[in-house]
Design a protein with these regions (language model features):
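Active-site acidic-Proline motif in GNAT/NAT acetyltransferases
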Residues: 98-100, 104, 132-133
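Conserved amphipathic alpha-helical interaction elements at protein-protein interfaces in regulatory
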Residues: 103, 116-120
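Residues that form or flank phosphate/diphosphate-binding pockets in enzymes
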Residues: 87, 105, 136
Length: 157
């Protein structure tokens, strides 16, 4: 992979329609795996949260969904969005490199592209959420200079 060849391409409507159910299922699985709530409640939360951000489908204002492309090959996807009335920071809500392409520098290069996208839109920062059990992602974000701004913890009794 050459960083020069890596690009963000807006998803087509068909790609979005295929991606969205996978996104909901993946988000629900992360919530349930964290122990925050049972699987069914996690699924319902994932559906509500996703519907809130994509009320108008792929063309919802403030939400940007990209394929991460290495030349003509899709290696992952990225969802950037405005979380509320204050547009800054832009949030990297979902960022995933396909399993077959992990460990080859795509994640680092894609995050740099996300930062460029935020700058191009006049943002002064790019935020993200990382689940506590995702040590690979946490290590990547630390190495790129991201700082912890909030943390949730729990103890099962």
């Amino acid at each position: 992979m050459s960083e020069a060849e890596l690009t963000l391409r807006p998803m087509t409507r068909a790609e979005f329609d295929e991606w969205l159910p996978r996104q909901v299922a993946g988000y629900a699985a992360l919530i349930a795996a964290s122990g925050a709530m049972p699987a069914q409640a996690a699924r319902e939360k994932a559906e509500r949260d996703t519907a809130r951000y994509f009320g108008s489908g792929a063309a919802t204002p403030g939400q940007l969904v990209f394929r991460i492309m290495d030349g003509e090959v899709s290696v992952g996807w990225l969802w950037l969005g405005v979380p509320g009335p204050d547009p800054d920071p832009l949030m990297a809500w979902v960022f995933e490199i396909e399993a077959a392409f992990r460990g080859r520098g795509y994640g680092r290069a894609a995050m740099r592209l996300a930062e460029e996208e935020a700058r191009a839109r006049g943002m002064t920062s790019l935020g993200l959420n990382v689940h506590g059990q995702n040590m690979v992602a946490r290590s990547l974000y630390d190495s790129l200079g991201y700082e912890v701004t909030a943390m949730q913890m729990k103890k099962t009794l």
